[in-house]
Swiss-Prot record:
Name of this protein: Small ribosomal subunit protein bS6
GO biological process assignments: translation
Originating organism: Limosilactobacillus fermentum (strain NBRC 3956 / LMG 18251)
Keyword hit for Glycoprotein: no
Classification via PANTHER family: MITOCHONDRIAL 28S RIBOSOMAL PROTEIN S6, SMALL RIBOSOMAL SUBUNIT PROTEIN BS6M
The keyword Transit peptide is assigned to this record: no
Entry keyword set: Ribonucleoprotein, Ribosomal protein, RNA-binding, rRNA-binding
One term of GO molecular function: small ribosomal subunit rRNA binding
NCBIfam families membership: S6
Entry-linked CDD domains: bS6 (cd00473)
């Protein structure tokens, strides 16, 4: 199967402690790697104010992960677990050219 590039952007709640945020990012990077994806880059982008309130939050820390993967298994697992995480307010997976 062909290797494809993806960009995953997720928003982390702003009131999380720095150590917990680092553990969260490491855990989700590991989920991708354990399911067959290669994490090319994983970094915080910025803490930004939202156009509308998400839950009780008006801002959040955007985190961007660039990955390559041969199948959708790692992305599907990331998507499934991100939906259950209270620390991730929103997430988006985009296939890159």
């Amino acid at each position: 199967m062909e290797t494809r590039k993806y960009e995953i952007t997720y928003i982390i709640r702003p009131d999380i402690e720095e150590s917990a945020k680092s553990e969260l990012v490491a855990r989700f990077d590991k989920i991708l790697a354990d399911n067959g994806a290669t994490v090319v880059d994983s970094a915080d982008w910025d803490t930004r104010r939202f156009a509308y309130q998400i839950g009780k939050y008006t801002e959040g820390t955007y985190h961007i992960v660039n990955v390559t993967a041969d199948s959708d298994a790692s992305l599907n697992e990331f998507d499934r677990l991100a939906k259950f995480s209270d620390d991730i307010l929103r997430h988006m997976i985009v296939k890159r050219g």
